[in-house]
Amino acid sequence: MLLEEKFLEFHRYASSHNLPLEAISVGDENKVLCEMHYAANAPRNIYSHTKSFTVTAVGLAMEEGKLSLEDHVAEVFKDKLPSNPDPNLEKIQLKHLLCMSSGFGKALLMNEDRRPGVGAPDYEKYMMAQPVPVEPGSAFCYSSADSILAAHMVCLLYTSPSPRDRSLS
């Protein structure tokens, strides 16, 4: 009972001081002992959590044999390529996107690029037209664009023939 009393005491303190809490949970190695969610129905920006969802979806697609870390971005989005794509663009593989080492060399679709309209409505076409000054796989550069492209690769698998099927036709 002491744990529940201390937990409620903390809850009252947090509430009375308007602490910006999302949730609090106390558990041992086997189960949740006490838990409280604040503003559970309030929308929130989850930022980098999206990357976790994307890599999970990639893993599931790989498990089904629909996707490989070796798949090339330019092959998947070949209908979005400009007439003269950057030679390094054709070297970018899914594994580079997941490790944020695509070679774009800067954080795309972030910071000032977050304003409405940048890259929209066709992110794939926008990204395929970007210069790739760094050898893919050689340098880390945090970029939302890498995650967006990886997520779009997965989306294509479940909304149209798979990239492998398209490349065989």
Task: List each language-model region with its residue ranges.
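Well-ordered alpha-helical segments within folded domains of soluble proteins
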Residues: 53-56, 145-153
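A short, well-structured edge-of-sheet supersecondary motif
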Residues: 6-40, 69
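Conserved small/polar residues in nucleotide/adenosyl-binding loops
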Residues: 158-165
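Basic/polar N-terminal segments that are highly enriched at the extreme N-terminus
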Residues: 1-2
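Active-site-proximal loop and beta-strand segments within enzyme catalytic domains
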Residues: 12-17, 43-50, 59-142
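Flexible, glycine-rich phosphate/dinucleotide-binding loops
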Residues: 33, 82, 166
